[in-house]
């Protein structure tokens, strides 16, 4: 959605987008508010299949021993990632694999330096164009090594690696019936079962 700004009462000075974003989060619990390339975006509450797909992704990561306290990484949901594209820019990936010392990388507005992120993952919703386009550039510019997209609309899993200034150099697309291997740099050898993830993310009717 378009950028949102507000004026200070009695002045012509615009409020920082961060202040607007924080107020929106207070008023809309459960909604995801982000600032990407200077644009404020608001994603609605996730549905059940979105959460089911996310759980299905997490299970093999946890089964591989990630985030068990003995590894160098943690698997986390919904933490803020500071973006270099603007002074207030940040994103909130659905899932992240971060260095175990991520607390040492806390920056402003409860976000974390992208240097501690090994992987980010988005499960698409109605804002799938943001995940498939704008966030590709945003995460690449932040030099996040791996970006995974669960595209529920088209029933595919995208694995993007090798970030460049305008996007990722490698972009692999996997369909149901295939395994989507993740780079060992995340901390373990893990492949995602695309069929299981796509079925989990489909409407339950």
Predicted regions and their residues:
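Gly/Pro/Ser/Thr-rich low-complexity, intrinsically disordered segments predominantly at protein N-termini
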Residues: 1-119, 123-142, 146-205
């Amino acid at each position: 959605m378009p950028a949102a700004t507000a004026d200070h009462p009695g002045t012509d000075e615009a409020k920082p987008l961060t202040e607007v974003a924080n107020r929106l989060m207070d008023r809309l619990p459960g909604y995801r508010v982000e600032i990407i390339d200077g644009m404020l975006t608001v994603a609605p509450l996730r549905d059940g299949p979105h959460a089911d797909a996310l759980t299905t992704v997490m299970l093999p990561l946890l089964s591989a021993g990630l985030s068990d306290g003995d590894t160098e990484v943690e698997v986390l949901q919904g933490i803020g990632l500071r973006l270099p594209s603007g002074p207030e820019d940040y994103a909130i990936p659905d899932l992240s694999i971060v260095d175990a010392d991520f607390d040492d990388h806390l920056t402003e507005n409860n976000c974390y330096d992208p240097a501690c992120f090994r992987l980010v993952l988005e499960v698409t919703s109605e804002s799938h164009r943001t995940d498939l386009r704008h966030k590709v550039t945003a995460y690449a510019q932040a030099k996040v090594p791996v970006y995974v997209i669960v595209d529920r609309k088209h029933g595919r899993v995208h694995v993007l690696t090798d970030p460049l200034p305008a996007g990722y150099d490698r972009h692999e697309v996997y369909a149901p019936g295939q395994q989507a291997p993740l780079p060992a740099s995340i901390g373990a050898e893990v492949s995602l079962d695309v069929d299981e993830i796509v079925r989990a993310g489909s409407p339950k009717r």
